[in-house]
């Protein structure tokens, strides 16, 4: 009788399409919601701080479940877990769509998060089981399509929906697709490995939940409240202590819930560090570009989304291709080329002005998307290929946990840099516009006089208007310079990643050399062969 792995291996692409559809919906939904936040504030009559809990709550549930995913996969099997995850996500999406108030909306988001938090490591683990290391790049390339294309196309789609329809369509539209994925998966998805009746490590689970939830909450609040805020400091410290205790406890455990011994494998450790750097760079663009395009330049959500659309198309095309290239050339060439492109294009964003052409930003973003598409999945696959099959679920859980944490910390750090540098530049501009400066005073008086003549207004009115104009431009210019400085830090992160990528190697060749060496050791020595 064929095993579940053999049945799935007969037609892996059909199963892969179903898995990608489910994962794509979960990731796309997060991007769609970000654009809808202002409309939800108006609809439910809540503040920006309150509405942010739709994102914070989702992130916290994700942060708790992802480290537990290795245990859940082993205990319940891939098939049951995928069906439950998709059911939770689809149910939560429906609740969000019909939500009459904010409380119901938040409940829907938390239900969604239960499914979304499990899907990413689960899908990744399943791909590792379906595809052998020599052809794994192709499968991971398609996995990267959902990971990178969904957040890239989300702003365009959500901007178009909000401009022409109600925000509820963003949720209603996902429900039937989610239902179809559940039905198809029910019939074609078989367990790769049979579930094992293992016990939950209660202490480890408590330490994990307290640690990751506290750290993620503290870091997410640091972006708005600052790192010196008492609540931010206390939650980050509690989270850090609990995570250290969790690591020590897991290393001493005979059957760890999350096996930190995966870091004994050098390429997995190296690829994890590079992926942390890439994640920070990716989140920098996702966070800062909408601020620049919408808050400073004045584009609509749809215009901003359309600017990002060519980059999304590049990712759509390149993600599967990068997987094929990985299978042929290995990780190092792709990582070096991808990071070179990412370094150059990220640096280009340090040169933004309030008048930077729309097409120039679009071109840079598209080229940057090309570089990113060569990076994320090949680098991650290189690390996963080094792990033995028994550690696959632990490796995917670890990779996704690090991605979640680095994304949150990266966003908070970039927010802090952007805010602090904006304040610094504003104070510098204010110093230059001091009335004690004779050059400024002369220019200011000329502007006031010209305005009085051209608009036929009083001196006080003209003076107020000129001051308002100066402060407005000072605010715009300082914000743009703050964004440029934040992108400079992201560029330096990418340079560090580029240096590290030189040390990547293709572990498939290591395994091949080891196999040949073992085969040669079994051959008789030349003298023995001659005598026989």
UniProtKB/Swiss-Prot annotation:
NCBIfam families xref list: efflux_EmrB
Mode of membrane association: Multi-pass membrane protein
Keywords assigned by UniProt, alphabetized: Cell membrane, Membrane, Transmembrane, Transmembrane helix, Transport
Species of provenance: Bacillus subtilis (strain 168)
Compartment annotation: Cell membrane
GO CC annotations, alphabetized: membrane; plasma membrane
Pfam families named in the record: MFS_1
SUPFAM superfamilies in alphabetical order: MFS general substrate transporter
Name this protein carries in UniProt: Uncharacterized MFS-type transporter YhcA
Family, similarity comment: Belongs to the major facilitator superfamily. EmrB family.
UniProt lineage: Bacteria, Bacillati, Bacillota, Bacilli, Bacillales
Source species, domain of life: Bacteria
Residue ranges of the TM segments: 13-33, 53-73, 80-100, 111-131, 142-162, 169-189, 203-223, 231-251, 273-293, 306-326, 334-354, 361-381, 483-503
Encoding gene, per UniProt annotation: yhcA
GO MF, one annotated term: transmembrane transporter activity
């Amino acid at each position: 009788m064929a095993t579940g792995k053999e049945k799935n291996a007969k037609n892996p692409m059909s199963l892969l399409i179903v898995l990608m559809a489910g994962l794509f919906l979960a990731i796309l939904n997060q991007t769609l919601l970000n654009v809808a936040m202002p409309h939800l504030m108006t609809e439910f009559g809540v503040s920006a701080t309150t509405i942010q809990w739709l994102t914070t709550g989702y992130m916290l549930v994700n942060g708790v479940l992802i480290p537990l995913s290795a245990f859940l996969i082993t205990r319940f099997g891939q098939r049951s877990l995928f069906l439950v995850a998709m059911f939770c996500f689809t149910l939560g999406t429906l609740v969000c769509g019909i939500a009459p108030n904010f409380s119901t909306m938040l409940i829907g988001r938390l239900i969604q998060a239960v499914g979304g938090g499990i899907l990413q490591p689960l899908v990744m683990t399943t791909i590792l089981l379906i595809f052998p290391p020599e052809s794994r790049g192709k499968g991971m390339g398609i996995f990267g399509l959902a990971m990178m294309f969904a957040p890239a196309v989300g702003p365009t789609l959500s901007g178009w929906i909000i401009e022409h329809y109600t925000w509820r369509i963003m949720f209603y539209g996902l429900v039937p697709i989610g239902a179809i994925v559940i039905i198809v998966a029910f019939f074609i998805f078989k367990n790769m490995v049979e579930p094992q009746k293992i016990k939950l490590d209660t202490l480890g689970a408590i330490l994990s939940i307290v640690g990751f939830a506290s750290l993620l909450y503290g870091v997410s609040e640091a972006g708005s409240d600052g790192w010196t805020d008492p609540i931010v400091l206390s939650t980050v410290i509690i989270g850090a202590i609990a995570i250290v205790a969790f690591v020590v406890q897991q290393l001493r455990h005979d059957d760890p819930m999350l096996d930190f011994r995966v870091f004994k494998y050098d390429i997995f450790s190296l690829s994890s560090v590079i992926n942390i750097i890439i994640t920070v760079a990716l989140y920098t663009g996702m966070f800062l570009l909408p601020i620049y395009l919408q808050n400073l330049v004045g584009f609509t959500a749809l215009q901003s989304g359309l600017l990002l659309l060519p980059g999304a198309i590049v990712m759509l095309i390149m993600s599967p291709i990068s997987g094929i290239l990985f299978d042929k050339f290995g990780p190092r060439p792709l990582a070096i080329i991808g990071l070179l492109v990412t370094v150059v294009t990220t640096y280009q964003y340090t040169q933004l002005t309030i008048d930077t052409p729309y097409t120039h930003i679009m071109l840079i973003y598209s080229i940057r998307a090309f570089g990113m598409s060569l990076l994320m999945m090949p680098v991650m696959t290189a690390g996963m290929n080094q792990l033995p099959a028994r550690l696959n679920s632990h490796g995917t859980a670890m990779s996704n946990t690090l991605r979640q944490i680095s994304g949150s910390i990266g966003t908070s750090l970039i927010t802090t840099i952007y805010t602090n540098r904006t304040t610094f530049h504003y104070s510098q501009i204010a110093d230059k516009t001091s009335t004690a400066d004779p050059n400024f005073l002369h220019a200011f008086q000329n502007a006031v006089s010209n305005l009085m003549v051209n608009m036929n207004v009083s001196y006080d009115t003209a003076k107020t208007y000129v001051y308002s104009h100066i402060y407005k431009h000072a605010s715009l210019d300082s914000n743009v310079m703050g964004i440029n400085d934040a992108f400079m830090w992201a560029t330096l992160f990418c340079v560090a990643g580029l240096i590290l990528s030189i040390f990547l190697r293709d572990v498939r060749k290591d395994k091949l050399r080891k196999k040949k060496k073992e085969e040669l050791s079994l051959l008789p020595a030349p003298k023995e062969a001659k005598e026989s």
